[in-house]
Every structure is written in structure tokens, then in C-alpha cells.
Amino acid sequence: MAVPKRKTSKTRRDKRRASSYKLPRVTITTCPNCGSPKLPHRVCKECGHYDGKQVVDNSEQN
């Protein structure tokens, strides 16, 4: 039966476990219409454009 040759330290154990806790970095792009930061593949919150077209009318909010 396989047995570990040495005791695994708490630091080494925690470093191994921590790799699964890492969150992916959020990608932020700029809106080509107004230049404000936005998430990719989503409508711009500032101007309401998506894929070069006006999708949402934001004039009521302002």
C-alpha cells in the first residue's frame, strides 16, 4: 500500500487547495460608441448601443 514518505506541511496543503479558489479575471472592454467601460457581449449601460445599433433608449432615465 502506498504511504507518503513525509508529512505534507499545512502551507503546501493550503497552496494546493487554493488553486481551485482563484476566480477568473473580469474582462472589461470600451464601448465603441461612447467610450465608457462595459462587459463584452452586453448592451452599454451609458448609451444603450450593442453591435453598432441603438438597442435601449436611455433618454427616459436622464
UniProtKB/Swiss-Prot annotation:
Disulphide-bridged cysteine pairs: none
Biased composition (Basic residues): 1-19
Segments of this protein annotated with the region Disordered: 1-20
SUPFAM superfamilies, per the entry: Zn-binding ribosomal proteins
Gene Ontology BP terms: translation
One term under GO cellular component: large ribosomal subunit
Entry keywords, A to Z: Ribonucleoprotein, Ribosomal protein
Gene3D superfamilies referenced in this protein's UniProt entry, alphabetically: Single helix bin (1.20.5.640)
An example molecular function term from Gene Ontology annotations: structural constituent of ribosome
InterPro entries noted in UniProt: Ribosomal_bL32 (IPR002677), Ribosomal_bL32_bact (IPR044957), Ribosomal_zn-bd (IPR011332)
Pfam annotation, one family: Ribosomal_L32p
Similarity remark: Belongs to the bacterial ribosomal protein bL32 family.
NCBIfam families (alphabetical): rpmF_bact
Protein name: Large ribosomal subunit protein bL32
Organism name: Finegoldia magna (strain ATCC 29328 / DSM 20472 / WAL 2508)
Gene name per UniProt: rpmF
